[in-house]
Amino acid sequence: MISYLKGIVAGIQNVGSNRVILTLEVNGMGYDLQIPQRLAKQLPTTGDLVQIFTHYQVREEIPLLYGFSSPAERDLFRHLLSVSGVGAASAIALLDTLELPDLVQAIIAANVQILIQAPGVGKKIADRICLELKAKLIEWRKSAGFFVATEGPAPGILEEVQMTLFALGYTAHEVSHALHVVSEDIGLPKDAYVEDWIKQAIAHLSSSEQVSH
């Protein structure tokens, strides 16, 4: 089994609307790997040396390679594939929608509303992911070297805050980051009013938009 490949970035191309293919030159051979869009944005320009952690799969007798930025990201991809009804496209969509710790936290907390923000992931699949992976990920996160963050609104408040922000057009990644900032930097209590969480999160998101412009 191929654990990782270390080689030169020969090219990155978008195939269709949601597939990104990295061509990696290793010892004179070119390997095509499907990678998350998030990884594609992190990779250096063509010609630079990189290390990509891989998952090998044979589908309909066609060998496929998937590439990831870390062993933890690859292992979580494999956990997602173990869930009935979850294919590579859905697993990569989840990895692209949320940062690794946020995705693990959402699954362990059975936060279906944030999981269904990933393209192609419906409520039924999200429920199944939470049901089948919660116990596994509680153990796995320890060996992976990180713990699920405890900041953010209390569970009873979180879903209402998230749904309000999603309705305003913010992405799952933007919402998770904003709630982290509001909790860690501003110090808003977990049991503060829903309106306070929403107000502070929007203030942060609005200021971030102004900076980006």
UniProtKB/Swiss-Prot annotation:
Pfam families on file: HHH_5 (PF14520), RuvA_C (PF07499), RuvA_N (PF01330)
Region (Domain II): 70-148
Primary localization: cytoplasm
Region span, Flexible linker: 149-158
Subcellular location: Cytoplasm
Gene Ontology MF term list: ATP binding; four-way junction DNA binding; four-way junction helicase activity
Cellular component GO terms held in the UniProt record: cytoplasm; Holliday junction helicase complex; Holliday junction resolvase complex
Entry keyword Phosphoprotein: no
Coiled-coil regions listed in the entry: none
Job of this protein: The RuvA-RuvB-RuvC complex processes Holliday junction (HJ) DNA during genetic recombination and DNA repair, while the RuvA-RuvB complex plays an important role in the rescue of blocked DNA replication forks via replication fork reversal (RFR). RuvA specifically binds to HJ cruciform DNA, conferring on it an open structure. The RuvB hexamer acts as an ATP-dependent pump, pulling dsDNA into and through the RuvAB complex. HJ branch migration allows RuvC to scan DNA until it finds its consensus sequence, where it cleaves and resolves the cruciform DNA.
This protein's domain notes: Has three domains with a flexible linker between the domains II and III and assumes an 'L' shape. Domain III is highly mobile and contacts RuvB.
Name the UniProt record assigns to this protein: Holliday junction branch migration complex subunit RuvA
Upper taxonomic lineage: Bacteria, Bacillati, Cyanobacteriota, Cyanophyceae, Nostocales
